[in-house]
């Protein structure tokens, strides 16, 4: 297996279908990548809805995993434990990717290199209007000036999370996300594997699309509500 795509999901809404549809439309051969969709902290009706969608698309390369334990870090760890790919890419369930996302990242893949792509952010319902996004700004800085200027906090921002990258599994090995952190677990994980980085390769194409306002706010509200419910019943 060449690539494992790991998607954590909690009480997904319609945006998950967009995410899965974008992976269904990949130009990269479907038998060369697997999708590990980890439904965490919930089960029905979401599990049945996902199974119905996958059946309709005949997406045989998707492995749906359900766990009652809530948490994006736990979900990603489950995906890593099950991953068979030589390379890993993480995608949030409210983001989607261009048809050539996997193909173009893999074309530049090397065992000692992380391939990175250009993120495009917009508000829900207005994809034609690109919004300012700190990750995009960090990418532009890295792509245009990294070879001329010293490393700075602007560069580090791009590595604050695992998405928008194709990471060699040999970088990760047995390292996992720390489930004890409520915030900053992405940063810690990237720091843990940073000792393996030798080269970075930037693809200056819009391959990763993220909705930075409406969907992320809704996801945060869902997670806060879930935590409150847990606190009430414990």
Language-model features: where?
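Short aromatic/hydrophobic "clamp" motif used to bind/position activated sugar donors
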Residues: 88
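Acidic donor-binding segment of Leloir-type glycosyltransferases
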Residues: 20-66
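Cell-envelope/extracellular polymer assembly enzymes that use nucleotide-activated donors
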Residues: 2-4, 22, 34, 188
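Conserved donor sugar-nucleotide recognition element shared by glycan-biosynthetic enzymes
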Residues: 46, 72, 76, 101
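Donor-binding/catalytic cores of nucleotide-activated saccharide
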Residues: 93-107, 112-184, 188-200, 210-224
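Catalytic metal- and UDP-sugar-binding loop of GT-A-like glycosyltransferases, i.e.
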Residues: 68, 91-93
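Glycine-rich, basic loop-to-helix element that forms the pyrophosphate-binding segment
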Residues: 67-83
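A conserved hydrophobic helix/loop-capping motif in glycosyltransferases and polysaccharide synthases
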Residues: 3-19, 26, 38-40
């Amino acid at each position: 297996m060449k690539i494992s795509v790991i998607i954590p999901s909690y009480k997904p809404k319609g945006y998950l279908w967009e995410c899965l549809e974008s992976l269904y439309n990949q130009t990269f051969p479907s038998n060369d990548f697997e999708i590990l969709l980890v439904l965490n902290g919930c089960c029905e009706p979401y599990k049945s809805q996902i199974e119905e969608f996958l059946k309709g698309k005949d997406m045989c390369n998707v492995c749906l995993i359900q766990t009652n334990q809530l948490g994006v870090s736990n979900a990603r760890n489950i995906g890593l434990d099950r991953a068979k790919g030589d390379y890993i890419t993480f995608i949030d369930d409210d983001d989607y990717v261009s048809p050539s996302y996997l193909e173009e990242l893999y074309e530049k893949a090397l065992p000692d290199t992380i391939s990175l792509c250009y993120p495009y952010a917009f508000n829900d319902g207005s994809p034609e209007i690109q919004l300012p996004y700190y990750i995009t700004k960090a990418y532009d800085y890295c792509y245009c000036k990294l070879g001329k200027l010293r490393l700075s906090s602007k560069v580090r921002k791009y590595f604050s999370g695992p998405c928008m990258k194709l990471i060699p599994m040999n970088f990760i090995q047995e390292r996992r996300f720390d489930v004890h952190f409520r915030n900053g677990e992405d940063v810690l994980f990237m720091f843990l594997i940073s000792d393996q980085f030798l080269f970075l390769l930037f693809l200056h194409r819009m391959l990763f699309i993220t909705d930075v306002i409406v969907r992320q706010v809704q996801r945060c509200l869902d997670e806060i509500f879930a935590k409150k419910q847990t606190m009430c019943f414990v």
